[in-house]
Amino acid sequence: MTVSFEKTSDTKGTLSFSIDQETIKTGLDKAFNKVKANISVPGFRKGKISRQMFNKMYGEEALFEEALNAVLPTAYDAAVKEAGIEPVAQPKIDVAKMEKGSDWELTAEVVVKPTVSLGDYKDLTVEVEATKEVSDEEVETRLTNSQNNLAELVVKETAAENGDTVVIDFVGSVDGVEFEGGKGSNHSLELGSGQFIPGFEEQLVGTKAGETVEVKVTFPENYQAEDLAGKEALFVTTVNEVKAKELPELDDELAKDIDEEVETLDELKAKFRKELEESKAEAYNDAVETAAIEAAVANAEIKEIPEEMIHEEVHRAMNEFLGGMQQQGISPEMYFQITGTSEDDLHKQYEADADKRVRTNLVIEAIAAAENFTTSDEEVKAEIEDLAGQYNMPVEQVEKLLPVDMLKHDIAMKKAVEVIATTAKVK
């Protein structure tokens, strides 16, 4: 195979390559076996025509196109590997020469990854708003939330206040006409929770059990039901009950109810503090990592990012998101119906920062290459086991799905991120 690659820009070029006679013969054999099944010739049963007779009647050239289709993918991949390039999109392939008895010559217009000129990526100074410190107030807030979760709702005769729960029947209408989904009975609603349309809950503050009130609201302009968006509505609402939270005593007994692993309130507070310290430390490290990566990307220079890479990233992100939804039992159709959005909306959402994601990946890849990381078999095995546990899949299935080269690439990317983050200094 003869291969050459000539760049026409930083991200485009022409790949010229040939297909040798032995490979062509293999392709012709495959092509003949495929097309002969549909050929009927007097003196032969359908599909039983000999190769010699076929060539005599139609000429071997009649098989060229099918033969090329059979061998082109492998030949193109081999040419790409020999040229040492990384195409990022489907090529536009043209046949330069296709004659009987000669090697076939082809050209492919390819889009390749852009050149990345790295700047500083180690020992970067970054600023982050996150902190690892845990205040007494944060511990008390966690404790209060746990106390609220164990509160009992007790019926009260007095007027509803913010934070109370009202049990209501309601019928909604727009211009005097009831609409689908606008009716409910014995619905429990915590006032101030923001569960209902803005303005609804506020109008129930001060009501008592047995009262019926008219609640007037306006649906938000971006409301998921387009026929209601921006319209004024009237909800005739009957308050059946008003309930107030009765908080349990904050003592050792409650501490044991909240967490069976502790014996006292002080032990619970200490445990909450430790958990908060761990979560804040993780958030802090994530913030440092993000800031350091952004700085490393800003220090690098990439002349041009091909549109094809942007499109590929958008579709990759969309497929990953929708695939995650399907794992939760939500089909794409169901997701778009629930959210009141469309595939175009999701495309625009991921398109907004696709350039940043592609640019970041390119810089991290370049850093991994500059550091010349090596990956051991033990690291690959550990990565496979980690992924198997993460996605609840057998190790053998992960091994079949993910090529070793891809796993090594991902491990190298993680090592590059670690270099950027662990050497960074916070102002």
UniProtKB/Swiss-Prot annotation:
It is found in: Cytoplasm. It catalyses: [protein]-peptidylproline (omega=180) = [protein]-peptidylproline (omega=0). It is an enzyme of class 5 (isomerase). Residues 163-248 form the PPIase FKBP-type domain. SUPFAM superfamilies: FKBP-like (SSF54534), Triger factor/SurA peptide-binding domain-like (SSF109998), Trigger factor ribosome-binding domain (SSF102735). Belongs to the FKBP-type PPIase family. Tig subfamily. This is Trigger factor. It comes from Lactococcus lactis subsp. lactis (strain IL1403). The gene is tig.
